[in-house]
């Protein structure tokens, strides 16, 4: 599917024609990864999605949403914005019931057209209200002022709570793992996959935690397996806090892209009965130690609301804040 639209004022060179193309994995995947890598190398931050995060959306999140929950695939509602030479200059990427964008420097004016498209084409991803409307959610970095202005102009309202982009530089760290007797930080290569997946699930769904890690979780195992299809999987790893009796306390997964020398840590989960003991901090220090051995320069983690404090305690610094903007349409 293609659209052609006129965008005004692109790069201060007057009007420009923009091609809008629905994402086709076979045709566009490599192009998108290249675009995201180039954007990161130029910006050196998470204003543009990391390539690993895009893979996580394809191979884990979409499997969870579609195959396990029966919802629409995000990938089916992803759009490329191309210039008249068919170079990607922007992406519309839904993540569940949210609208996200990645835009090349100099093309900031396409955000309005992206919103036009999103408000029309992404509707099936949102639950309908009784009156047939949807609560459309836009995710925008606070550092991108023109997006805030456009959202306010359109009547969007900003939530009080928001997200945080957090970064740490493994090559500058020198961590020693410090845990109480009977606990240890380990990597996940030799542990049972069902137990790891179930422990992660229990961290997000404490009411399901009956203490038994040997049972298949209610959801998440298909997406756990799906992640293995990512091109980044071979260089990626898990970090956990484990009791001597084999019980798993905390779990996280770390995607690694050697080309950009970045890591993306997602998900991070601590079971409720093991919280407030500093286990997430030590688990993430284990991640930093391995990334340092690998020579990775920057490690990123996204956090919502109060969870940012967990990552700050583990040595991460917040490099940008992210707001959630709502409008009923």
Feature locations, PLM:
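Conserved hydrophobic beta-strand within the GNAT/NAT acetyltransferase core sheet
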Residues: 136-139, 265, 298-303
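Conserved active-site tyrosine of GNAT-family acetyltransferases
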Residues: 147-151, 311-312, 316
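Phosphate-binding active sites in nucleotide-utilizing proteins
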Residues: 210-211, 220-225, 232-244, 248-257
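Conserved donor-binding loop and adjoining core beta-sheet/short helix segment
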Residues: 24-26, 37-128, 244, 248-266, ...
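Acyl-donor-binding surface of acyltransferase catalytic domains
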Residues: 2-13, 95-183, 189, 323-328
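Short amphipathic alpha-helix that is part of the acyltransferase structural core
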Residues: 6-61, 178-220
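A structural microfeature
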Residues: 90, 160-163, 250, 320
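Conserved acetyl-CoA-binding loop-helix of GNAT-fold acetyltransferases
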Residues: 108-124, 270, 276-289, 293, ...
